[in-house]
Amino acid sequence: MQPQYQMGYDRAITVFSPDGRLYQVEYAREAVKRGTTAVGIKCNDGIVLLVDKRVNSKLLEPSSIEKIFKIDNHIGVASSGLVGDARSLVDRARVESQVNRVSYDEQIDVEMLSKKLCDHMQTYTQFGGARPYGTALLIAGISDGQFRLFETDPSGTLLEYKATGIGIGRNAVMKVFEEEYNPEASIRDAILLGLKALHAATEGKFDVNTVEIGVVNNDTPAFRKMSRQEVASFVEQIEQS
C-alpha cells in the first residue's frame, strides 16, 4: 500500500508531490538502477565504454544482446535500463547526427548531441499522455580534438565526467574509480581499470561473452566496438590478476 502522502501524485507525470517530487521520474531512475552496469572512462589518448550484458540463460545468444551503439564515426553510447527505450534514443541520436551532417557538412559536436537528447528526454517529464524514458546513456566521443564523456538521466539532466558508471553496479564502479582513476592512463590501462570496476560490480561474474567494449582514440579518431578476440585478451588479464 502506498504511503498517504504519496497517493495520487505518482499517477500523473505532470503533478508534483507536496515536497516537490515527480514520482514517475524517480521510478524511471529506479529502472536504470536495476539495469546492467555500464562504465565510461576518459583517458590520456581516448575514451572507453564497457558494459556487462548479463546473459541470464545458457540458451541465449550473447551476440544478440547489444548495449553499446555507434551513433556516428566519432560518437558511441552505452546504455543501462530499458533496452527498448535506449534503442529509441539511439535512433534519434543517429538522425540528429545525420541531419547535422547534411545541413552543415560537418560532424555534430558531442556536447550538442548530448544536449539535444536530454532536451528530448526532458519533454517526457513535462507533458501528459507519455512516460519518462527508463534508460540512461553514457555518450562518448571526440570533438575538436577533445575527448568528451557525458551521462544522461531520465529527467533530462546532463553531466560530464572523467569516469563514471550507471546501472545496478554504479556504487561499486565509482568506488574503484575514486581510488584508482588516473587521467594520464593509456587506452589499454583504462580498459583494464574498466574491467576491474565491472569485476567488482558483478562480483566476478563476467566473461568474454558478457562483456562489450567500445573505444575512440587518437590513433583512429573514430568510434569502434572491439572484436571478441580483443575483449578476450583483456578479460584474461583480469581473470589472472
Swiss-Prot record:
Regulation: The formation of the proteasomal ATPase PAN-20S proteasome complex, via the docking of the C-termini of PAN into the intersubunit pockets in the alpha-rings, triggers opening of the gate for substrate entry. Interconversion between the open-gate and close-gate conformations leads to a dynamic regulation of the 20S proteasome proteolysis activity.
One GO cellular component term noted in the UniProt record for this chain: proteasome core complex, alpha-subunit complex
UniProt GO BP: proteasomal protein catabolic process; ubiquitin-dependent protein catabolic process
GO molecular function: threonine-type endopeptidase activity
Protein location: Cytoplasm
Record CDD domains: proteasome_alpha_archeal
InterPro entries, per the entry: Ntn_hydrolases_N, Proteasome_alpha, Proteasome_alpha-type, Proteasome_asu_arc, Proteasome_asu_N, Proteasome_sua/b
Cell membrane among keywords: no
Pfam families named in the record: Proteasome, Proteasome_A_N
Entry annotated with the keyword Cell division: no
SMART domains linked: Proteasome_A_N (SM00948)
Assigned keywords, A-Z: Cytoplasm, Proteasome
Coarse class of the protein's main subcellular location: cytoplasm
Quaternary structure (record): The 20S proteasome core is composed of 14 alpha and 14 beta subunits that assemble into four stacked heptameric rings, resulting in a barrel-shaped structure. The two inner rings, each composed of seven catalytic beta subunits, are sandwiched by two outer rings, each composed of seven alpha subunits. The catalytic chamber with the active sites is on the inside of the barrel. Has a gated structure, the ends of the cylinder being occluded by the N-termini of the alpha-subunits. Is capped at one or both ends by the proteasome regulatory ATPase, PAN.
Function summary: Component of the proteasome core, a large protease complex with broad specificity involved in protein degradation.
Similarity comment: Belongs to the peptidase T1A family.
Protein name: Proteasome subunit alpha
Species name: Methanosphaerula palustris (strain ATCC BAA-1556 / DSM 19958 / E1-9c)
Gene: psmA
